[in-house]
Amino acid sequence: MLKTAGGYESMITKYISELVSYGKANGLIEECDEIYVTNRLLELFDVMEYDVKNENSDAKDLSESQKCENSEEKHEAASFRPVHEILEDMMKYAFENGIMKEDTITAKDLFDTKIMGCITPPPSIVRKEFKDKYAVSPKVATDFYYSFSQASNYIRKDRIARDEKWVTDTEYGEIDITINLSKPEKDPRDIAKAGKAKKSGYPACLLCKENEGYAGHFSHPARQNHRIIPVTLDGQQYYMQYSPYVYYNEHCIIFNAEHTPMKIDHAVFKKILDFVRQFP
């Protein structure tokens, strides 16, 4: 379906307005970012017209307690559609208008992450807020970071909800059982495309710090909405992130600033104890 200046194109501007309002309500962007972020999204969807008055009136109004200047309240989101539903509508428009060339799982994951990258604050902002909240308490800081990772759709809550979890009694005590269903199966078309893609050694692996903001491709996930937190452990630079697949509650990953082989030795346990000291 070709876009027109009329009804169908007006739908994408409504979705853009809805996503911008979602971003403000969830603390991803502030009021002063609204025009900038809207323009980035209009560029992404190749839209030339935007009725500011109508789109702003159609967007859900935020109460005073939900405006960005009240930083303690900004994560108390208004009642919006789940972000994956907004993104699904945006991707449908993108595919039908030739902006997104394929509609496979990987192609959609690459594109919706690119969308979310437009409303995800830069590393400096996220790290400053984490540091400010850490000054209150480590728990306040990590709670913020976990909520942020969900709001940015780095942790895809709709997929995590599919996981099967239960506790079973055994002769050794209770054991938590998890069947992880949040990581989607590869489409054969994606596998074929990844096999033909030019090989790249950047980033060196899926955990390296260079993944932050990376666009990704058919054999490497997009990470435009990914933000990492620096931590110093036993005098060495490390980074912290939450796992996008949440294999267990608030699944956290700590990784070296350098791409180095994983090795279990005395130094590792010193770093683990240092981390626990900083985040009791």
Write out the residue ranges for each language-model feature.
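Long, well-ordered alpha-helical scaffolding segments within enzyme catalytic domains
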Residues: 264-279
